[in-house]
Amino acid sequence: MKVRVKAPCTSANLGVGFDVFGLCLKEPYDVIEVEAIDDKEIIIEVDDKNIPTDPDKNVAGIVAKKMIDDFNIGKGVKITIKKGVKAGSGLGSSAASSAGTAYAINELFKLNLDKLKLVDYASYGELASSGAKHADNVAPAIFGGFTMVTNYEPLEVLHIPIDFKLDILIAIPNISINTKEAREILPKAVGLKDLVNNVGKACGMVYALYNKDKSLFGRYMMSDKVIEPVRGKLIPNYFKIKEEVKDKVYGITISGSGPSIIAFPKEEFIDEVENILRDYYENTIRTEVGKGVEVV
C-alpha cells in the first residue's frame, strides 16, 4: 500500500507580502512516495546526500511522525524522496517535502483531512527547517495558486486560484541562503511610513489578481521598502539584473529568502528576459502557476 505524489516548489513573500503571500509554481517539484510498513518506524530514502535521513532531522520524517502519532495509525512508513527543488534556493524545498508527505499520508491512510489541516501538519516540517512554524510556502504547495496566511492561532489561509495565464521565469544562482540566517539580518523594527507603504501595496496586489491586472500586480510587488533592500545584497547581481529588465517585466523580486529570483515577463519579452537571466545564472527555468500537490 503506497501513494506517490508530486509536490511543487513555491515562491513566498513576493515583495511586500513578507511571511504572508505565497505562489505555487508548476515546476520544479519533488516526487515523494509514502509506503505503509508493518514495523512502527519511519524510514527515509532521499537522492540528495546533503539531506539527513534521520526521521527526527528530516522534515518529511517530522511531519510523518506527527501525523502517525496524532491519529494512532499503528503502522510505520517508508518515505522515498526524489528532490527536484534545490535546498536553500528560496523555492520552498523543505515545504515541498513537508507538504508532499502530509498530503500522501492523508491519502494513504484515508484520514480525510481538509487542505487547511494539511497545511498545519506540513508546517511542523518548516519549524524544524527554519526555526519558525511558518506556512507561507506550505500553504501554496497544498492549495495551489496564490495564498495568504493571515493568522496562526488558529491557522487561517486565504486562497485565490489563478485562472489566467501568468508567465514566470525563475533564475536559480548556484549558491544557497539559509532561511534562519536570512531572517537574522532583517530589521527588528519598521517605520510607520514603510509599514503603510507595504500594507497598501500588498492590498493592491490582491486587488490586481482579482482583476487579472498583471501590470499592477508586478509594480506593487516591486515596492517593498523593508525586506528586499536588505536581502537583495546577498544575491550577486540582483539589483543589476532588476535594473536591466525593468521595462521588460511586469515585476521581478526575490523568491522567498533567496537566492532565486522570480520574474513575471511581459509576453513580448519573455525570450529576451529569459536570455538575460540565463546570462547571469545558467540555471534559469520557464514555468507557470501550479495547482498544488497531486497524486501521480
Swiss-Prot record:
Keywords of the record: Amino-acid biosynthesis, ATP-binding, Cytoplasm, Kinase, Nucleotide-binding, Threonine biosynthesis, Transferase
Binding site for ATP: K86, A87, G88, S89, G90, L91, G92, S93, S94, A95, A96
Pathway entry: Amino-acid biosynthesis; L-threonine biosynthesis; L-threonine from L-aspartate: step 4/5
The organism of origin for this protein: Methanocaldococcus jannaschii (strain ATCC 43067 / DSM 2661 / JAL-1 / JCM 10045 / NBRC 100440) (Methanococcus jannaschii)
Alphabetized GO MF terms: ATP binding; homoserine kinase activity
Gene Ontology cellular component annotations, sorted alphabetically: cytoplasm
Entries under Gene3D superfamilies matching the protein: 3.30.230.10, GHMP kinase, C-terminal domain
Recorded name of the encoding gene: thrB
Biological process, per Gene Ontology: threonine biosynthetic process
E.C. number(s) listed in UniProt: 2.7.1.39
Domain of life: Archaea
Role, per record: Catalyzes the ATP-dependent phosphorylation of L-homoserine to L-homoserine phosphate.
Keyword set includes rRNA-binding: no
Protein name, UniProt field: Homoserine kinase
Catalytic reaction list: L-homoserine + ATP = O-phospho-L-homoserine + ADP + H(+)
Keyword Transferase part of the UniProt annotation: yes
Cell compartment(s), UniProt: Cytoplasm
The family this protein is said to belong to: Belongs to the GHMP kinase family. Homoserine kinase subfamily.
